[in-house]
Amino acid sequence: MKIVVAKNIGFCFGVERAIRTVEELLDEGKKVVTDGEIVHNKQVMEQLTKKGLKVSSEMTDGEVFVVRAHGIPKDRLEELKKIFPEVVDLTCPIVSQLFKTAQRYAKERKVIVFGKEDHPEMVALRGYAPAIVTKVPFKFEEKKVVFLSQTTSSLEEYKEFVAAMIRMNEFEEAVFLNTICPVTVNREREVEELSKICDLSIVVGGKHSSNTGKLFRIASKHSKTIWIESPDELPADVVKYGTVCVFSGTSTPNSLIENVVRKLKEMEGKRDGTI
């Protein structure tokens, strides 16, 4: 079995920044709270809660409130500043830029965002601008629109959505902006190419992670693909595949990927009788 690990793996800079900041605050002995997953990865969240991070939607007691990488609605942010002595905004800079862009364009045209309506990033965005969030093309009466995208969406799926919207409607002015994170686009392109040479693609990342799900869908077009959160989820028959490729979402730590590769080698060794 040949194991090929993608070049673009591990945390993106926004996730790394968020986790590092929370760990530093906890190491300082501060009582840190938040209202949801800092990042969409179960193992990372377990590690942070073990260190003392408190997660609750009802939490009002603490020294420091940390805003998740996905952001929160503007009004909610202002409320939190009145409740907590310190609020640390860990919204990914690329996500923050999306919010500002939506807010600016909403003054002159209708904002249509390609994304998951219930995703935390989209919930936060609607706190900055009255946007329509959907992944399904629809008929629309407004003549002036701007198209934006959730930062973790597939670029190709976003383009297909916009093309369908233009075919279905008669817009007088339609602005198309690529607001997808370039880090996720690079991973998307690598998975698109590398999965073509794989007998099995393994995508490692949280099951609630939008960008990990995107990579799973892309790899599935070209090879047998599984999506796992931990090495324990590797199926016994993984050793029957000739070339196995390993990919990861942007919320997946390098240590987890290393553990998956180690487990694959152990499974291969047991099959060959070398372990």
Curated annotation (Swiss-Prot):
The keyword Iron-sulfur applies. One of its GO terms (biological process) is isopentenyl diphosphate biosynthetic process, methylerythritol 4-phosphate pathway. It holds the Pfam family LYTB. Its cofactor is [4Fe-4S] cluster. Binds 1 [4Fe-4S] cluster per subunit. GO terms for molecular function: 4 iron, 4 sulfur cluster binding; 4-hydroxy-3-methylbut-2-enyl diphosphate reductase activity; metal ion binding. It is an enzyme of class 1 (oxidoreductase). Catalyzes the conversion of 1-hydroxy-2-methyl-2-(E)-butenyl 4-diphosphate (HMBPP) into a mixture of isopentenyl diphosphate (IPP) and dimethylallyl diphosphate (DMAPP). Acts in the terminal step of the DOXP/MEP pathway for isoprenoid precursor biosynthesis. This is 4-hydroxy-3-methylbut-2-enyl diphosphate reductase.
